[in-house]
């Protein structure tokens, strides 16, 4: 029982809650969920509100057509108009008209009314906008006068005129507001007149003249005047009211006209918009028509294609049914099977026949191979027998002659025809074996030569160190001697001449002494150092006066004087180290130490420093010859690239003039030749030095510092520099009238008494002997005075001073370390004197490309010896030289494994003497030779000559 009650209560609560929720559902949500199509709401516009009427209008809804052509079923069917919740009228929807107007009349003034407008569709659904509230206008007081109707005059008949003597007063006129009263008023007057006077008063409107008033009494006139005044006031009031009505109606009409104008403009705009819409619709219609036509065409084409495809599919289905039948497939299969079996049988038959042929061919090949092996063995045996036989001399000479013809003379290469001929030779022939043997011999000789060269380079480095030490000692001693003042004696010239003659005798006597075999270069250097120390001690103790040599007292070039051992060792040391020294010894102080008077006249080649003779006070005959020769060497780059070549000259005193003439003949690169070398000969230079006036310079300028490295001290030492001799000459000439005669290094070396025996005895450059050419080629006169040990050491240290064959020999300083004995016999000399006493040289080469010596190619520069063998030699600044334009050159293949290079070496050995074959191998690591295969002297090369005559002031 309680459970049922509880459930009933819960059910009632649930139902009430659901009812509440259902009632609170908005109508819009219900309409949207049920998808009810309600009619659209129509807006009502109020046009005019009057005191008793209201005018409204609204737009009619046009009927919309659906896609299927039928009319829309949800269009508005009619409208309902309510006034104060009271239905006034039902207006149907007229889609043909745009607006519907309605005027509600019979309303009260100043009363508020509620207007409701409801739209209903054909299904009965309604839609309503919010209600419209409006109030009518108030009614005015003089509204009765504001009428367009004129009030007529109510007095239609004239009243009877009373006589003047009548005493009865007329009755007062009633008001004009009421015609009835007026008409009553008239009827009363008439009755009183008839009753009183028995006649009616005329109307005052008929009284138009004054004569008409004569019959009336004053009272009557008063009454008429009052009535006229009342009428006049009435007319005036009507006039004012009419004017007001006119103004109001005018304003209303103007406003209405403005409204109509705006309405008309709206109508025009609407028409324009409608026209534009119509045009756009027409255009869209045309576009849609075109699209429809295109689509119809596409549809027609697609239909045609579909029909064709259907027909094709039907045909294919028929063909498939015909072709895929089992009977036809079986027939085709059996046909193909029979054909394949027949082809297989034919192929098997062909294979069997081919196998039989192959077996026959293999048997025949085996027989042929056996016969071939037997023939090869017999041929090899015969060839070995023939190769073991020595080649006939005639055949060998013919082969060598052909190869010699095919060899190029300039570079030793084989031509293409020669390489083809060499490749055709049998590799097992005795000629090839002989060539290989010669190559092995050449390689062994080359290895020995390299070993000897490395030993010589080590010796040269040791000698350079000794030279540096000696130069330091020499410089210290010279500074002490140079600082001492010179004594001005009257017999300086005679003393100098006597000293020179005594010096000649002493030098000739000392050079003729036998030399011991154990004497070495170090011994001679020690001898010079001991002499220097003795002179230093004597100068420190006694400080004897110094006398400079007279150039006239120098020994002539044709007088034979034997060199002493000390000078010989000094010369060998100076000759070995000259090639290793740089030209920076004298290049840095040229412009600083050169006087202004010699700025353009002083030659920049090389000058001999002052030669001083120290004479002891005790009258001893012992003297020491101090000779320091400085030579402007070319840069290391030029020294390393140019190779030495031996030449012979008939007169060494005119070497510079000969070089100058050769420079004039060389016109390939005239820009590289200095202008200073175009105006001087040897005689002119000698005359210049003898005629030059001395210039007095203070002794303080000759002082110099003795500190620094041995090689760098040359730069700061004015005495050792090439121009220091001129300063020394000027200082000495301040007290001595005998001028100095400085010479170049070449002339000073040739005029040195210690070298006269070498100058007069024969040539330094001659052909080597078959045996030890460096030690056993000394003439009989030399072997009597010089021991074999000294001669061998001298030849090793000075390779240019080889045994002599000719009469007049120049000493050519050069890169002596790269000269090989095999090239010493390349050139010979013919002596041809000229009219101007300057000897011209005509060089006769042993091969056609002799002129290429003067056109050496300097494009491929090899490193200097110091860089190649890592020698610790002080190197000065390199003077940049102008590189000539490149000329076509032939690069030789220096590989020992090359057939052409090996054959060229063999060819050179076979063409020269047997002794040359042992010494003709060149080091592949050494600088390359000239295009003609010959080495040139560094002094006689083009760059050497340019550096000889080129002023150093231009290189700075």
UniProtKB/Swiss-Prot annotation:
The modification Phosphoserine is found at residues 501, 520, 802, 842, 895. GO terms for cellular component: cell periphery; endoplasmic reticulum. Signal peptide: none annotated. It comes from the Eukaryota. Keywords: Phosphoprotein. Residues 153-165, 488-523, 552-563, 578-599 have a biased composition (Polar residues). The modification Phosphothreonine is found at residue 154. Present with 149 molecules/cell in log phase SD medium. This is Uncharacterized protein YEL043W. It comes from Saccharomyces cerevisiae (strain ATCC 204508 / S288c) (Baker's yeast).
């Amino acid at each position: 029982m309680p459970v049922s009650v509880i459930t009933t209560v819960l059910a009632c609560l649930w139902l009430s809650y659901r009812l509440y929720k259902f009632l609170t559902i908005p109508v819009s949500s219900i309409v949207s969920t049920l998808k009810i199509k309600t009619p659209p709401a129509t807006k009502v516009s109020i046009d005019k509100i009057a005191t008793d009427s209201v005018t409204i209008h609204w737009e009619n809804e046009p009927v919309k057509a659906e896609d299927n052509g039928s009319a829309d079923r949800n269009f508005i069917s009619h409208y309902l108009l309510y006034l104060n919740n009271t239905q006034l009228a039902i207006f149907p929807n007229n889609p043909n008209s745009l607006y519907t107007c309605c005027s509600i009349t019979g309303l009260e003034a100043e009363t508020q009314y509620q207007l409701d407008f409801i739209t209903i569709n054909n299904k009965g659904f309604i839609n309503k906008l919010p209600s419209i509230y409006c109030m009518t206008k108030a009614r005015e007081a003089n509204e009765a006068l504001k009428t367009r109707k004129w009030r007529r005059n109510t007095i239609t008949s004239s009243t009877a005129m009373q006589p003047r003597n009548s005493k009865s007063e007329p009755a007062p006129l009633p008001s004009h507001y009421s015609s009835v009263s007026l008409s009553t008023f008239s009827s009363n007057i008439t009755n009183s007149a008839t009753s009183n006077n028995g006649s009616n008063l005329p109307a005052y409107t008929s009284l138009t003249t004054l004569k008409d008033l004569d019959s009336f009494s004053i009272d009557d006139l008063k009454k008429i005047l009052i009535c006229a005044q009342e009428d006049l006031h009435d007319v005036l009031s009507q006039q004012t009211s009419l004017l007001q009505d006119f103004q109001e109606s005018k304003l209303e009409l103007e406003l209405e006209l403005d409204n109509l104008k705006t309405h008309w403009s709206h109508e025009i705009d609407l028409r324009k918009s409608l026209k534009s819409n119509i045009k756009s619709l027409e255009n869209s219609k045309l576009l849609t028509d075109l699209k429809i036509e295109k689509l119809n065409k596409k549809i027609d084409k697609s239909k045609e294609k579909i029909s064709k495809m259907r027909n094709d599919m039907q045909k294919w289905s028929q063909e498939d049914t015909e072709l895929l039948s089992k009977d036809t497939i079986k027939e085709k299969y059996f046909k193909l099977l029979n054909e394949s079996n027949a082809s297989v049988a034919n192929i098997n038959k062909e294979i069997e026949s081919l196998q039989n042929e192959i077996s026959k061919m293999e048997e025949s090949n085996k027989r042929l191979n056996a016969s071939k092996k037997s023939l090869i063995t017999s041929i090899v045996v015969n060839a070995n027998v023939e190769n073991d036989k020595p080649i006939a001399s005639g055949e060998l000479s013919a082969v060598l002659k052909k190869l010699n013809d095919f060899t190029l003379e300039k570079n030793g290469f084989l031509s293409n025809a020669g390489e083809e001929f060499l490749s055709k030779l049998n590799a097992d022939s005795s000629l090839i074996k002989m060539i290989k043997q010669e190559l092995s011999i050449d390689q062994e000789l080359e290895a020995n030569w390299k070993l000897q060269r490395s030993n010589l380079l080590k010796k040269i480095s040791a000698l350079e160190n000794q030279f540096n030490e000696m130069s330091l000692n020499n410089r210290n001693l010279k500074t002490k001697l140079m600082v001492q003042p010179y004594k001005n004696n009257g017999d300086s010239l005679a003393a100098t001449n006597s000293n020179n003659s005594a010096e000649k005798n002493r030098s000739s006597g000392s050079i003729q002494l036998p030399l011991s075999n154990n004497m070495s270069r170090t011994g001679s250097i020690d001898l010079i150092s001991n002499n220097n120390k003795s002179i230093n001690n004597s100068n420190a103790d006694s400080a004897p006066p110094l006398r400079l040599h007279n150039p006239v007292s120098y020994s002539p070039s044709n007088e034979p004087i034997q060199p002493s051992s000390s000078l010989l060792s000094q010369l060998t040391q100076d000759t070995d180290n000259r090639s290793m020294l740089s030209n920076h010894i004298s290049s840095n102080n040229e412009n600083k130490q050169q006087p202004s008077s010699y700025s353009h006249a002083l030659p920049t080649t090389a000058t001999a420093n002052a030669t001083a003779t120290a004479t002891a006070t005790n009258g001893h005959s012992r003297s020491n010859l101090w000779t320091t020769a400085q030579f402007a060497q070319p840069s290391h780059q030029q020294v390393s690239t140019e190779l030495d070549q031996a030449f012979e000259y008939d007169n060494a005193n005119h070497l510079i003039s000969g070089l100058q003439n050769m420079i004039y003949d060389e016109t390939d690169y005239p820009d590289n030749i200095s202008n200073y070398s175009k105006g001087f000969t040897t005689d002119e230079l000698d005359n210049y030095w003898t005629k030059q006036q001395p210039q007095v310079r203070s002794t303080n300028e000759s002082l110099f510092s003795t500190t620094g490295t041995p090689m760098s001290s040359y730069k700061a030492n004015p005495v050792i520099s090439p121009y220091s001799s001129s300063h020394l000459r000027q200082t000495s000439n301040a007290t001595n009238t005998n001028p100095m005669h400085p010479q170049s290094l070449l002339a000073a070396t040739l005029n040195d008494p210690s070298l006269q025996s070498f100058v007069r005895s024969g040539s330094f450059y001659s052909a080597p002997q078959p045996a030890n050419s460096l030690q056993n080629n000394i003439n009989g006169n030399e072997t009597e005075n010089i021991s074999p040990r000294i001669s061998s050491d001298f030849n090793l240290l000075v390779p240019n001073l080889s045994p002599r064959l000719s009469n007049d020999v120049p000493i050519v300083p050069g890169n002596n370390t790269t000269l090989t004995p095999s090239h010493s016999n390349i050139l010979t000399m013919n002596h041809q004197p000229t009219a101007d006493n300057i000897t011209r040289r005509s060089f006769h080469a042993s091969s056609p490309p002799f002129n290429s010596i003067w056109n050496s190619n300097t494009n491929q520069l090899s490193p200097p010896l110091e860089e190649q063998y890592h020698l610790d030699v002080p190197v000065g600044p390199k003077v940049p030289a102008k590189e000539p334009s490149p000329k076509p050159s032939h690069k030789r293949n220096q590989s020992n494994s090359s057939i052409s290079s090996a054959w060229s070496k063999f060819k050179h050995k076979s063409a020269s003497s047997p002794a040359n074959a042992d010494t003709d191998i060149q080091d592949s690591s050494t600088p390359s030779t000239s295009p003609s295969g010959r080495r040139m002297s560094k002094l006689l090369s083009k760059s050497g000559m340019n550096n000889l005559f080129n002023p150093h002031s231009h290189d700075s």
